[in-house]
Amino acid sequence: MSAERYLNHPTFGMLYLVAPAGEGRDVYATLYAQKMFFLVTLQPRGAQFEVIPFLDARHHAEIHLSRCRRENSPEKDRWQELFHQTFI
């Protein structure tokens, strides 16, 4: 991942990418109040936002981080740092 990804939520403002969640979905968190998490599905005509609990967001991030470790991804350190900044 070469650059951070952001989305603009119509009510909660800027969201940043926390982790891919699979099946064309990603987990995003609010930029200024980091404890709101969304499962976002990008669609041709916009985005679908689903609020998810902290532990669900963390679970998706842990799964992604485990996959990066298993595949020895060059982005592993970046995802590890983002995980710690967001959840620890």
Question: What is the role of each PLM region?
Answer:
Residues 1-55:
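Long, non-catalytic architectural segments outside compact domain cores
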